[in-house]
Amino acid sequence: MADENSSAYWERRAQRFADRGEGLAAVCSYGMPDFYNRAIQLTQRRALSRWLRFEPGARVLDVGCGVGRWSRLCAMRGANLTGIDVSPTMVGIAAQRSYHAGIADRCRFLVQDLVDLALPDRFDLVLGVTVLQHILAPARLERAVLRMAQHLAPRGRMLLLEAAPVKATRRCDSAIFAARQRCYYQQLFTDCGLRIRAITGVDPAPFRTWALPYLRRLPGGMHLATTTLVSALSLPFDLALAPWAVDQSWHALFVLEHAGGARA
């Protein structure tokens, strides 16, 4: 999800990539080798694994669910899952894949912009993976966080994984992406009535994030080969060091809960 005109962007991207393989190019990085996106997914899953736990029957909201990769994981673990996304194609594929996985009875998928979210439910877990980094307008970003806080049950937990480096940098920013400084998110969450329970690292190895702006300039074959090599070098470091090298991590997993009531 991103700013007001971005739903068309995500729909075009979904139509092009969502039904290819696992659909990672639709929700991670398109134009990159498959190994690159699989490495991203591995580091994300490693970071989420400690916190993505709940009782059977727990109500889980997956915002910006894409093709439903985290939605299916939650439903397979016994959650009653609601997934939302601005792309009708993404939502359709997520529903289709939940059916083929035999978990359709525990899943519902809705075409919905997070900024305008207004469901009658409150959720034990609200999950968002690389969603806020695509909401560029500050007012819409704050509204999105408030909407999630308002849908979180009183004793619920919120997991938000975003590009959030400790030091400010714009070298990877684009028309649909912003890597905001970590302290910006921390203040935003506090302002929206949330308490930060923990911050976990995701990808502290510097090779990929330092090299990415330059790798994109290489010719096609060289770009794919070099990106795969850099990802392969980064992955062991990311998986091994992420729990401890939090300040060095490009992405961060924020573990949040109510601090006594979110603003209306």
Label each region the model flagged:
Residues 203-264:
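A C-terminal cap/extension of S-adenosyl-L-methionine-dependent methyltransferases
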Residues 142-154:
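A short glycine-rich, Lys/Arg-flanked "PGG" loop and its adjoining helix->strand segment in the class I
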